[in-house]
């Protein structure tokens, strides 16, 4: 009705939003900064798996290191402590994390031989290591800065480097040498724009545990070129046989080193998202960078508080992971079965993992003519309802590897690898 009392037909009266609806709608595209950001562990093939599950199919997920679905439960003492702490975990904490948890991190590394001393102000807690990696690279990198990352790698490092405007540069690890980093290749990749060196040890996806000699050579190169050291050591307690883990910071007490670790794997609480970052070495020339990490920590307000209460009891209590990796332990048994069964498949070879939760088998190109390993993974999913991840998803340059987690029960793991072998016998692209 108009002001003069006349009834208006709203079906023909041109209202502003009515006119706009006849115009071309504005498109909202993905940001250009995501153009080079990939995370194939939960990529397109994972979406196909979700569709199959919705249709009622049972999918054996060997694509992600998530212990809980395979019957690996957190120690009871961790669960009890979190439940008891819930009434006190309703508000925000300090942006770096609660003091008791940060003290527990400091105490943990006092027991690591040669690890440089640091205090609670050098510790940042995070919603898993993943958040802390992203924060660190956002605080560090300007457009075009280069970060040396192993190939194969845990792809979050490459994705987060690209997201921060940096350029990931991959140095090769040598399969013939147990997946140890190729020092000559690493040195050849260093340029004036190189800012940091990422070391993933024990390695995901290969399971390699780096020798003291290799780590020393890597540190020597970083020292020569004044590179920041970024040490991803989330699997440092998941070691098999006589493997010994050496923390990178312990070899480089004179260098700025950021060590990343957390509860997700060794303490089987991946869903809690409880990680930490410890900064060691001389900090006087990195105050602005560290201030940037603090700024980003403030912006996210704080890590989730209930999970922070798991850190002190986890680090100070019985280390139950040892029961799983020593002789008779479930993780060791499953590692052995995966390695043995994979090497029994004609044309497939696998370096024996010395740590972590994965196998990274090679498909001999002389036997398997694979041009597209993502298509191979999709075809395996559709045929066998087994979900793995293609090797190129870990920034390996050739389509000749797969990554499988070794978390399923031995019987299920052996059956899955047997089905993989049967599938490969007749597979053609």
UniProtKB/Swiss-Prot annotation:
The keyword Protease does not apply. Pfam families: Aminotran_1_2. One of its GO terms (cellular component) is plasma membrane. InterPro entries: Ala_Aminotransferase, Aminotransferase_I/II_large, PyrdxlP-dep_Trfase, PyrdxlP-dep_Trfase_major, PyrdxlP-dep_Trfase_small. Its cofactor is pyridoxal 5'-phosphate. Keywords: Aminotransferase, Cytoplasm, Pyridoxal phosphate, Transferase. GO terms for molecular function: L-alanine:2-oxoglutarate aminotransferase activity; pyridoxal phosphate binding. The modification N6-(pyridoxal phosphate)lysine is found at residue 265. This is Alanine aminotransferase. It comes from Mycobacterium tuberculosis (strain ATCC 25618 / H37Rv). The gene is aspC.
């Amino acid at each position: 009705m108009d002001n003069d009392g006349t009834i208006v037909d709203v079906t023909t009266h041109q209202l502003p939003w009515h006119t706009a609806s006849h115009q071309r709608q504005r498109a909202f595209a993905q940001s250009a900064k995501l153009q080079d950001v990939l995370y194939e562990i939960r990529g397109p093939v994972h979406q196909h798996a979700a569709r199959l599950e919705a249709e009622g199919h049972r999918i054996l997920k060997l694509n992600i290191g998530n212990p809980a679905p395979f019957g690996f439960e957190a120690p009871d003492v961790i669960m009890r402590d979190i439940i008891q702490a819930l009434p006190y975990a309703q508000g925000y904490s300090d942006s770096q994390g609660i003091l008791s948890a940060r003290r527990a991190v400091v105490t943990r590394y006092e027991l690591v031989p040669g690890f440089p001393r640091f205090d609670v102000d050098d510790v940042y807690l995070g919603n898993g290591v993943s958040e802390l990696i992203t924060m660190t690279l956002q605080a560090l990198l300007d457009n075009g800065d280069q970060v040396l990352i192993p190939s194969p790698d845990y792809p979050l490092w490459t994705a987060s480097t690209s997201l921060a405007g940096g350029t990931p540069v991959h140095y090769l690890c040598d399969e013939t040498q147990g997946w140890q980093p190729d020092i000559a290749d690493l040195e050849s990749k260093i340029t004036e724009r190189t800012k940091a060196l990422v070391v993933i040890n024990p390695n995901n996806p290969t399971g390699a545990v780096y020798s003291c000699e290799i780590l020393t050579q890597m540190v020597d190169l970083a020292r020569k070129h004044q590179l920041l050291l970024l040490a991803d050591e989330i699997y440092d307690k998941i070691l098999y046989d006589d493997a010994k883990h050496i923390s990178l910071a312990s070899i480089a007490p004179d260098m700025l080193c950021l060590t990343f670790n957390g509860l997700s794997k060794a303490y089987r609480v991946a869903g809690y998202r409880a990680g930490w970052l410890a900064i060691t070495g001389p900090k006087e020339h990195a105050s602005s960078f560290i201030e940037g990490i603090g700024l980003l920590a403030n912006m996210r307000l704080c890590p989730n508080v209930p999970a922070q209460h798991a850190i002190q009891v986890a680090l100070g209590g019985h280390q139950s992971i040892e029961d799983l990796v020593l002789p008779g332990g479930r993780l060791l048994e499953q590692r052995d079965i995966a390695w043995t069964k994979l090497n029994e498949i004609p044309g497939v070879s696998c370096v024996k993992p010395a740590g972590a939760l994965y196998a990274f088998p090679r498909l001999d190109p002389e036997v398997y003519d694979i041009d597209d390993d993502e298509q191979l993974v999709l075809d395996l999913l559709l045929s066998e309802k087994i979900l793995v991840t293609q090797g190129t998803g870990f920034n390996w340059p050739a389509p000749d590897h797969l990554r499988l987690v070794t978390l399923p029960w031995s019987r299920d793991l052996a059956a899955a690898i047997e089905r993989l072998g049967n599938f490969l016998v007749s597979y053609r692209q």
